Structure formats: C-alpha cells, structure tokens
C-alpha cells in the first residue's frame, strides 16, 4: 500500500507467475514478508510449512491421511534473494525428497528426524535476484549466518491456491485500489506487457 509502483514492478515478473501457476493453477493469492538474518543469527529447526506444518504433532494426527496429502498441494513456498548469499551466510537448508514422507507433519519435531535432517540436508548459494520455490512439505530450515558482515535478506513468498486459505490476512480491496492506478498507467504507456499484467 505504501509503494504500489514498486510492488507492480517486483511482482510483474513472468517467472514468478510461471512457477506459481505451474503448482497452483490460476487465481492464486500471494503473500510476502521480508526475512532478515544478521551475522550470528542462529539456524532454524527443520520443519514443514503451512497448513499442517504449524500444528502440534497431536493436532496434526487428528486429521486423516488424505488431508496430510492434500495440504501441501494448496500452497507453494518461495523466496527471492535480496542479496548475494554464500553458504557461510546460511541460506535455506533443504532435505531432498522429504516432501514424499507421508507422516512428516507428525514426525518433524522428533529429535531422530531432526538429526537425520542435519546429517543429510543440502544448501544452495543464491545470488541477488535468484528465486527458489518448493513444496511446503519439503523439510527445510533457515541456516545459521556465520558471516562477519552479511545481513542475509530474503523475501519469503507464501502462495495460496484460489481454493485455499492464506495464513496472513490480506485486505484485497485496499490492495486492488492501490494497484489499479499504477497498473493502468504502466499498461497505457507500454511499460507493462500482457504477460506481466497477467
């Protein structure tokens, strides 16, 4: 709402739309928040994300197996690097193929599973502007920032299906009103392509 022109330029990137539509189909809802980790910032514990990823193991166990299977299909997690991030700065740790572990929403808090994660995760250095998208059931955790002076900054994206429910509440009317003018102006003067507008 404070910088709609910047928002339009940032999120009009066709690559972001392509990743989101490939996972969720059209009419998805995007929420975003900046994650800033200063030098010395500690690593997160391995976890899964929304929806069931934020529940206790006991609460997750009350949902039938098909809900565990469906939940990660309703959301796409993403991140856009706002600075160069070498391995020392602690980019996100990922456990390949862990999204296939069906009881993962119940298991991720177990110490034996966390130990397995720490022994087998991978990390990818990112350059400013790089994006990463992944299934929210993939076990992941922000790494420890062991750098002396790099403030690791990532724009975390949570993209929800048109049939899902976003974790954050969004004032859609206010956002539409704020973006209408900049979108219309960029379209009228040719600074926005049809692919970017979509």
Please provide the spans of the model-predicted regions.
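Short, surface-exposed secondary-structure boundary micro-motifs
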Residues: 136-138
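Non-heme Fe(II) oxygenase catalytic core, chiefly the N-lobe of the double-stranded beta-helix
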Residues: 1-128, 141-150, 157-182
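Long, low-complexity C-terminal extensions of enzymes
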Residues: 183-198
């Amino acid at each position: 709402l404070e910088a709609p022109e910047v928002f339009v330029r940032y999120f009009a990137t066709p690559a972001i739309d392509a990743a989101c539509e490939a996972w969720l189909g059209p009419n998805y809802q995007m929420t975003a928040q900046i994650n800033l980790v200063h030098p010395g910032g500690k690593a997160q514990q391995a976890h899964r994300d929304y929806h069931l990823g934020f529940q206790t193991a006991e609460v997750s166990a009350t949902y039938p197996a098909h809900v565990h299977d469906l939940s990660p299909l309703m959301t796409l997690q993403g991140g856009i690097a706002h600075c160069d991030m070498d391995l020392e700065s602690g980019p996100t740790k990922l456990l390949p193929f862990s999204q296939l572990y069906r009881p993962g929403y119940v298991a991720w808090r177990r110490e034996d599973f966390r130990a397995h994660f720490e022994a087998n995760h991978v990390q990818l250095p990112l350059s400013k502007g790089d994006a990463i998208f992944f299934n929210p059931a993939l076990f992941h955790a922000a790494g420890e920032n062991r750098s002396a002076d790099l403030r690791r900054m990532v724009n975390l994206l949570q993209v929800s299906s048109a049939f899902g429910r976003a974790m954050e509440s969004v004032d859609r009317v206010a956002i539409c009103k704020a973006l209408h003018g900049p979108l219309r102006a960029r379209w009228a003067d040719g600074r926005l392509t049809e692919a970017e507008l979509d």
